[in-house]
Amino acid sequence: MIDLKVLITRARGQLGCDLEDDFLRIEGCQVISFGREEMDVTQSTEVQELIATNIPDVVIHLAANTNVDGCELEPDSAYRVNALGSRNIAVASEKVGAKLVYVSTDYVFDGTSQRPYTEFDTTNPISIYGKSKLAGERYVTGFSSKYFIVRTSWLYGEHGNNFVKTMLRLAQEKNELNVVDDQVGSPTYTKDLARFITDLARTDLYGTYHATNTGSCSWFHFAKTIFQMAGLRHMKVRTISTSELNRPAPRPAYSVLDHYCIRMEGLPDLRPWEEALQEYLRNQK
């Protein structure tokens, strides 16, 4: 007997795979997974037909253009997927009475704060990626009556490409690396985030949440910690500034998220990022 039907967009990504695994552990849960090929979120009619046919209880919306520099160079594509695609998902989900989980980003903030951002702080994205994801948030709040917006940051996991995998690969090819030290955020293990979302989606505590592994670091410190924990002591990491990379899109200098609403609702918080990273690296051996 099916007690819970969950539909996931972009289910082949690193977070999507972990979410599918987590939901399938729940007795009586059916998971319907759509990759890019099966559902084009920019096509309103297609989205409405697929959601109306399956009638899910929960929709987890992960489909997004997450290439920060690519979004800056092709803003139309960014807004088409991240904003209008999210509108299409929100409208279709509302029509069948489904709860909607929209995964957003720390890049909705400008990075000028001196303290971690709460869910109630003013958003002010400085990149097209951040602006398009914030537009998606606004469509979700405008069209869905049962939504969870989950802002997160610096994801890595078993599936797909990510910063940790890149560092481990480069350590096989080089003895030294340059990594930026003027961007600070919170690395987040997708397994931990998936567990949080799986639990949250089965509540009625609707609203916006900040969910990352706790604590913060710069990309430089993150890279150093990866090499230390992995026993790659031959690696020398040097600091550079973001401006030296000459990237198309600006990045917030400080985008640490305060889990204020998690604490307010008495929900279990995510563990420290160092602890999560250690487990991830153990699983890679």
What are these regions (language model features)?
Residues 27-49:
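Adenosine-cofactor binding site in Rossmann-like domains, unifying the SAM/SAH pocket
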Residues 44-81:
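NAD(P)H-binding glycine-rich loop region in Rossmannoid oxidoreductase-like domains
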Residues 80, 84-88, 95, 108-150, ...:
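Catalytic helix-loop patch of NAD(P)-dependent Rossmann-fold dehydrogenases
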Residues 9, 34, 59-63, 100-105, ...:
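SDR active-site strand-loop-helix element
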Residues 14, 203-248, 253:
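Mid/C-terminal beta-alpha module of Rossmann-like enzyme folds, strongest
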Residues 218-224, 241-285:
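Conserved C-terminal active-site "lid" loop/helix of NAD(P)H-dependent oxidoreductases
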